[in-house]
Amino acid sequence: MERREGGRDNSSCSNVNQLFGVKDSESLLYDDVFIVRDRNGDSYFAYWDIEKNTFLSEPFYSYRSRNSSYLPKIKAFMSEDRSQIHEVKNGFRSEDHSKINKINGVENLFHNYNMNVLTDDYNFKMGMNGFHRPQSKIHINRFIDSYLQSQICIATTPGSGSDNDSYIHGSRVYGESESYTRSEGRSSSIRTRTKGVELTLRERPGILDRTKKYMYLWLQCDNCYGLNYKKVLKSKMTICEQCGYHLQMSSSDRIELLIDPGTWDPMDEDMVSRDPIKFDSGGGEAYKDRLYFYQRKTGLTEAVQTGIGQLNGIPVAIGVMDFKFMGGSMGSVVGEKITRLIEHATNKFLPLIIVSASGGARMQEGSLSLMQMAKISSALYDYQSNKRLVYVSILTSPTAGGVTASFGMLGDIIIVEPRAYVAFAGKRVIEQTLNQTIPNDSQEAEFLFHKGLFDLIIPRHLLKSVISELFTLHDLFPLNQNSNQYSQYRALLNPIF
């Protein structure tokens, strides 16, 4: 591992093959087009044709008849005083020269490359003859590797100040790219750096498209599009290291976050749906097959986990929905499990927590799924109004549809995570129904909080302690395992499990 001056570790930039898992880095640029100018001022289009396995070029002026509408855009960002190369969004192939768009904010992208070297030393040919392997393979690889190395860095959050190893190691930083510190425990992101201008993968969607096979190592943030290393993301409570956005958590991770270790007792684990209305998928995947797919994918039997546990020593009944199981949709099994949980909490006088993450009622079960809204609400009425017990509703992103319209908004205390999406219908549906435009943030937690829909916006790392304090205010205290009260509590659970 190299060090730079000042004792800071350099970031990983040069080992392109290690990052992308390819032997020939030109395969990454099969759809990129470059505008090249030589010493004589002549301009060319250059691109890699993956089908012909060759690096092709075509004179700039040959595009006038076919792409005259795009020439002003191209000329506008070509430098007049020096040799420059610029990346053009929406790449070409030899059979497809339909569109050229300028990438925002990448003027002088290759400030430290002089294309005289490419045109003179590499025998850059005009027409459609281009470079051919194997004679030019070394030159092409060298050029493309330099391009990638100057633009792609594996970097941690700026200012981490730690000297620990990163998870992907590199060797050096090229040109004027700035070095970043590296630290274990801080997830990595792909950044680009040019003369102090920082570009994220939001501006480089092609890189993500070409590396999907390696995304099992990374989780992309829905807000900033930064990449988070999955091995450390769980220890960070699935919060984006780049922008602090609260990413989706699995139900198992949420139970681990809220419930004390060794106190979790699940309920109704073996309850599964049997396709009650024989849903017609219209030639698509059958409902039973979809259920089986998500059961294998998530390890769950349904879109909710319910059970009994302790939160900082306080016994609670808790249900946690999982959006990764068919979008957390509420069918007859989900409704039945939540109803049974509420009834058990009513009988045992336990505080109730339900964590919502759902797109709404499950269409494959028709009116049976809609009926769950009334069934759960009825059980909650007995729990809250007749027994006077405490129900805390926690809304996470996304919570929508029938869940929002029923138990999601019926809590005695409603807590929402920062920037969570909470809605009944989607923005597009509302605009088409009302025939008017609504603000983009009108369904975010902060906007709705100021309208009075929620009681608290609590970040994930404070959630457990805040709920514990709320229960204490309602005269619910931790159990002493040596007390008679704890023995009575365990005796109540034994007949159930």
Swiss-Prot record:
CoA carboxyltransferase N-terminal domain sequence ranges:
217-489
Q: Where are the zinc fingers (C4-type)?
A: 221-243
Q: Which organism is it from?
A: Cuscuta reflexa (Southern Asian dodder)
Which key words are in the record? Answer: ATP-binding, Fatty acid biosynthesis, Fatty acid metabolism, Lipid biosynthesis, Lipid metabolism, Metal-binding, Nucleotide-binding, Plastid, Transferase, Zinc, Zinc-finger
Q: Give the metabolic or biological pathway.
A: Lipid metabolism; malonyl-CoA biosynthesis; malonyl-CoA from acetyl-CoA: step 1/1
InterPro entries per the UniProt record, alphabetical: AcCoA_carboxyl_beta, Acetyl_CoA_COase_Trfase_b_su, ClpP/crotonase-like_dom_sf, COA_CT_N
Which residues are involved in binding Zn(2+)? 221, 224, 240, 243
Output one GO MF annotation. acetyl-CoA carboxylase activity
State the reactions this protein catalyses: N(6)-carboxybiotinyl-L-lysyl-[protein] + acetyl-CoA = N(6)-biotinyl-L-lysyl-[protein] + malonyl-CoA
Outline the subunit composition.
Answer: Acetyl-CoA carboxylase is a heterohexamer composed of biotin carboxyl carrier protein, biotin carboxylase and 2 subunits each of ACCase subunit alpha and ACCase plastid-coded subunit beta (accD).
Q: Which domain of life is it from?
A: Eukaryota
Protein name per Swiss-Prot or TrEMBL: Acetyl-coenzyme A carboxylase carboxyl transferase subunit beta
What does the Swiss-Prot or TrEMBL cofactor note state?
A: Binds 1 zinc ion per subunit.
Cellular-component GO terms for this entry: acetyl-CoA carboxylase complex; plastid
What is known about what this protein does? Component of the acetyl coenzyme A carboxylase (ACC) complex. Biotin carboxylase (BC) catalyzes the carboxylation of biotin on its carrier protein (BCCP) and then the CO(2) group is transferred by the transcarboxylase to acetyl-CoA to form malonyl-CoA.
BP terms from Gene Ontology:
fatty acid biosynthetic process; malonyl-CoA biosynthetic process
Q: What is its EC number?
A: 2.1.3.15
